[in-house]
Amino acid sequence: NKILVGSDDYDTWLRIAQITDQFLYVNKKLSYVLFHDARTSNNKDMSIPQRLVVRDFMHLFDKQQKLNLEIKLRYISGNYNYLNNNSEKAKKDFMFVIRNGVIRLKLRSLLMIILIILKNIKLT
């Protein structure tokens, strides 16, 4: 599914988890990720495919897990919108995170809103 590009591995792990919970934690680096300008997540709002991936599993989430997921997706969306100069949408997403997220994400979101304000002041 082309829509899920960038989130397809997440989809695979969720489907495996429906079959078994026999996962082991390996405290060792097994691979590396190369960050470059042409990677999919730079050019795409990754909250969209991630939202699509989890929709089939939402019935398994409790209220707090659903809220935590929404916070994560809004933070991802906010960053994408900031980078693509959609300031109003980014501010809306970051405000949701500030109202509902954990302190680390609240602070990051506040910083992003400050950057948006400073960027808008600089443009005027």
Regions found by a protein language model. Give the residues of each.
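Inter-repeat boundary and helix-capping residues of tandem alpha-helical solenoids
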Residues: 6, 67-68, 103
